[in-house]
């Protein structure tokens, strides 16, 4: 049986991917039996574009481990608009074909978004097209030269899809994520902060540094 992973591309995941790569190189870990699904892709984006999120994922991680390239799957951001719905439906089917997700590994956006699930996303949401919000567009400037070059939409695995994994990891580092992480972990579950839906998962694990955890009650008020 394959081990099936849904993988985000956020910069916060770089240390995680680096550690997994090191363990693979040291023969402590193998990805030969792994199937990887890219969590989201920009839309529309040219098939040959170097800025596709799958290319970022390959450069940061997948090209440096022993995974079979045929076991890497991504949403196609170059399909015609009338093919988007079928593309998303087939992605869901493919995940099921491999027996469902074993693990989801994600970063978090400043609006509490996971993958490209913007505020307002439902806990039942499946893979679909979604409009990229202004805050997310600013965050994506790291990948594109200007905010204007960021495509208007993403094809993303839904919150419901991501949470079908047996284990979900969410990572965040630094002061700029401390307020949002307090809301995600200690606040009410709400679709205005999609990451709060992780509170409903039986095996969700949040990995923070001390700066990102600064506003959590046990850190801010240990007494």
Q: Whereabouts are the PLM-identified features?
A:
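Glycine-rich beta-strand-to-loop/alpha-helix junction loops that act as flexible
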Residues: 7-12, 106-110, 173
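Class I SAM-dependent methyltransferase SAM-binding "motif I" and its flanking Rossmann-like core
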Residues: 115-159
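ATP/nucleoside-binding phosphotransfer catalytic cores, i.e., glycine-rich phosphate-binding loops
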Residues: 157-160, 164-223
């Amino acid at each position: 049986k394959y081990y099936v992973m849904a993988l985000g591309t956020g910069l916060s995941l770089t240390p995680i991917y680096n550690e997994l790569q090191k363990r693979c190189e040291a023969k402590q870990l193998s990805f030969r039996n792994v199937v990887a699904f890219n969590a989201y892709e920009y839309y529309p984006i040219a098939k040959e574009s170097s800025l596709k999120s799958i290319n970022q994922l390959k450069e940061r991680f997948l090209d440096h481990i022993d995974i079979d390239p045929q076991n890497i799957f991504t949403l196609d951001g170059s399909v015609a608009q009338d093919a988007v719905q079928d593309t998303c439906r087939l992605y869901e089917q493919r995940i099921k074909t491999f027996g469902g997700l074993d693990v989801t590994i994600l970063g978090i956006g400043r609006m509490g978004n996971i993958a490209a699930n913007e505020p307002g996303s439902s806990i039942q949401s499946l893979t679909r097209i979604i409009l990229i919000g202004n805050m997310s567009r600013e965050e994506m400037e790291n990948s594109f030269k200007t905010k204007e070059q960021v495509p208007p939409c993403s094809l993303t695995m839904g919150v419901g899809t991501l949470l079908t994994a047996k284990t979900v990891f969410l990572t965040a580092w630094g002061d700029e994520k401390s307020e949002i992480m307090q809301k995600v972990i200690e606040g009410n579950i709400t679709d205005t902060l999609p990451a709060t839906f992780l509170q409903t998962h039986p095996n969700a694990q949040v990995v923070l540094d001390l700066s990102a955890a600064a506003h959590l009650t046990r850190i801010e008020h240990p007494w």
